[in-house]
Regions:
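Hydrophobic h-region of N-terminal signal peptides that target proteins for export
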Residues: 17-25
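Stable alpha-helical elements in mature extracytoplasmic
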Residues: 95, 99, 145-148, 169-177, ...
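Short, well-ordered loop/turn elements at secondary-structure boundaries
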Residues: 126-127, 154-155, 248-250
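Aromatic-Pro/Gly-enriched surface loop or interdomain linker
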Residues: 26-130, 136-137, 261-297
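Short alpha-beta junction capping motif
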Residues: 62, 130-170
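An acidic, glycine-rich "communication" segment
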Residues: 32-37, 42-43, 70, 76-77, ...
Length: 297
């Protein structure tokens, strides 16, 4: 079991100050392009950005799940960074690249730089204790993927699902997980759960919007019209839901950060100083709590 350099409780403030002072001491940034062409739909095929030259099996590896989604433009894939991107690739690659860089910089967690992209049916998945799934509002899982995910979680693996908004997108995840394990139950993670204070004391899961949408209106939630319909309107997306999934033994096998985009806090940390100070610091604190819990329980 690894330890974190910074201590608990009051020492969170020291860490926050360190984060602010290091706001622009970052890995290289990549250029972000404009909107993709609407008359020629070509979906990008993102690749793993793991630094294989320095990869070590003894280090933490951020594994992002590759999956299929239903629908067309704006559904199965969306415009971003000048191209059409599949839902599973939301916040990739900079999200995990920055998170693993910060883990190495600020904690004693030794992490491989970048992320590894795997499908649920890839045999390699069983070699890693943690997997991350983004933007699953339109996700579809095959029977083989359902079986593989249940096997992974039953064998001690841990899943984090992030960045999906509104009741319709929650229901899609809930329905998929019901196919994975019908008897497993979701519950609300409250401030007294150990995951909220295992390293840094947090009173709640922060709500983090996509940076480009935050710049438009200053709200902490994404506007409901950009997500899966019907979504119930603004009240449906303005409240964060931080939920956990228990297996039949009562073990926490998955967490879901719903109505928030935690990974955007990592991805966009160097794009806007106000966004960094208001959102990125909290995004890293929650991530370290979740990863510490996942790796030690």
């Amino acid at each position: 079991m690894f330890k974190i350099v910074c201590g608990k409780s009051a020492r969170l403030g020291v860490w926050l100050l360190a984060m602010v002072s290091l706001a622009f001491a970052q890995p290289p940034r990549r250029f972000r392009g404009g909107s993709p062409r609407m008359d020629s739909i070509q979906v990008a095929d993102p690749k793993s950005d793991l630094d294989l030259a320095s990869f070590s099996p003894d280090r933490f590896t951020f594994v992002r799940v590759v999956y299929d989604s239903q629908g067309g433009p704006g559904e199965a894939y969306y415009p971003g960074d000048g191209e059409w991107r599949p839902r599973w690739a939301t916040d990739h690659p900079d999200g995990a690249k920055n998170l693993t860089w910060r883990l190495n910089q600020l904690t004693t967690i030794r992490a491989n730089q970048g992320s590894l992209l795997l499908r649920l049916t890839d045999p390699q998945l069983q070699d890693f204790p943690f997997i991350f799934m983004s933007d699953p509002g339109w996700q579809v899982l095959s029977e083989a993927e359902q079986k593989a995910l249940r096997q992974y979680l039953s064998n001690g693996g841990f899943l984090w699902v992030d960045d999906f908004w509104g009741e319709a997108e929650w229901k899609n995840l809930e329905d998929n997980m019901r196919q994975v394990a019908p008897s497993w139950t979701w519950f609300n993670i409250t401030a007294d759960h150990p995951i909220m204070s295992i390293v840094y004391p947090l009173s709640e899961c922060p709500q983090i919007p996509a940076l480009q949408l935050y710049r438009r209106g200053g709200e902490t939630y994404d506007p409901p019209w950009i997500h899966k319909q019907p979504n119930g309107g603004i009240p449906d997306v303005s409240k964060v839901n931080f939920r956990g999934l228990h297996d039949e033994r009562g073990r926490l096998v998955a967490v879901a950060t719903h109505n928030t985009d935690i990974a955007d806090g990592w991805e966009r940390e160097g794009d806007d100083e106000e966004f960094f100070q208001r959102f990125s610091v909290k995004a890293y604190a929650l991530a370290i709590n979740i990863l510490t819990y996942a790796m030690s329980n």
